[in-house]
Amino acid sequence: MAKTVAYFYDPDVGNFHYGTGHPMKPHRLSLTHSLVLHYGLYKKMIVFKPYQASQHDMCRFHSEDYIDFLQRVSPNNMQGFTKSLNAFNVGDDCPVFPGLFEFCSRYTGASLQGATQLNNKICDIAINWAGGLHHAKKFEASGFCYVNDIVIGILELLKYHPRVLYVDIDIHHGDGVQEAFYLTDRVMTVSFHKYGNYFFPGTGDMYEVGAESGRYYCLNVPLRDGIDDQSYRHLFQPVIKQVIDFYQPTCIVLQCGADSLGCDRLGCFNLSIRGHGECVQYVKSFNIPLLVLGGGGYTVRNVARCWTYETSLLVDETISEELPYSEYFEYFAPDFTLHPDVSTRIENQNSRQYLDQIRQTIFENLKMLNHAPSVQIHDVPSDILSYERTDEPDPEERGSEDNYSRPEASNEFYDGDHDNDKESDVEI
């Protein structure tokens, strides 16, 4: 039976700019959406311009002091916030940039709206490529992430769902989400990531398993450099199958960070776009309500290819290898294809013996789980959002410029892998 897929896209979200030389580029969202449109994938989805999250929404997880700071700070007044900048870890990796709070509001609102639509059975799958900012903590920013839209979305899902499974395939450990739900069995977190050699964020050892009621409801799969499609599949599919069999989640949140692809600027894995997509396809195959989010990904053209391909998998549509012409066509030179070779010369340091050892340890931990913990459901709080949305604009039409209040950053275009912006010679 065909799935109903809701797709959330804010036309302004790709026009925010972390600053010259910064590897995180919201502009990748504009590229992704352009491909989704030009491949005609929007015809297979319900397209929403998302809700913007309020301070109140963000404070469901974050501290009021921190969110109040995010709303008040700007590049023009940040000199007066020296103490707060340090306290909230805002500075180099997480800079203050124009429209910072508005950016957080837009990507968080989309994840929250996706969760609410899943709760109300408006859709079977909700997609927000702008979300998935998994490093943000209750009291501070971290790793290019300010507001943890994933945690806020999961808190909304928990109003209706007794058990939510969180799966993270970003190359970086999903530390902010793990920390938020470390003490509960209502959410099981499963993260596949690079671990060791001081790789950010430095957490995600196999022996971090949760505590108190959440003991054994946190599962980490620490990987080494150079993992390829075959090795990843050897771990991912059996682990996810066992987790779903044991935990029986009623909803799944999947963070699809694309920095686990080969050739990523900040990554050291060797997954192909097809291999990354295979994980999405596998999770979808369980037919459990699914919230799909973005995350990391710093080689912009490959992020757009990856998330477009995964959108096609989620709507069961085969798309051509040749990219359609679009306003961003030149980004995809020289091949202009959906699945270029992204393999690198990084050696796969994940031996079969190492992978089997991880698998064995994980399966032993899973045996410690109570099968599908039951939960006492109290009165369900009212939904944050109600939508009888009949006013959706045609996504094929650009619409008036009034809908695009934030112009594209003039230094957002760049050439090649080492030029981050046309005004910068900083190599990342």
UniProtKB/Swiss-Prot annotation:
Cellular component (GO) terms are: chromosome; cytoplasm; cytosol; nucleus; transcription repressor complex
Residue positions binding 1D-myo-inositol 1,4,5,6-tetrakisphosphate: 17, 21, 25, 265
The positions annotated for binding Zn(2+) are 170, 172, 259
Annotated region Histone deacetylase: the residues are: 3-316
Which segments show compositional bias classed as Basic and acidic residues?
386-405, 415-428
Give the EC number(s) under which this enzyme is classified: 3.5.1.98, 3.5.1.-
Q: What is its main location?
A: nucleus
NAD as a keyword? Answer: no
Active site: residue positions: 135
Could you say how this protein's activity is regulated?
Answer: Inositol tetraphosphate (1D-myo-inositol 1,4,5,6-tetrakisphosphate) promotes the histone deacetylase activity by acting as an intermolecular glue between hdac3 and N-Cor repressor complex components.
GO terms of biological process kind: circadian regulation of gene expression; negative regulation of transcription by RNA polymerase II; regulation of circadian rhythm
Keyword Hydrolase assigned to the entry: answer is: yes
Q: Which Pfam families match?
A: Hist_deacetyl
Q: Where in the cell is it found?
A: Nucleus; Chromosome; Cytoplasm, Cytosol
The entry's protein name is: Histone deacetylase 3
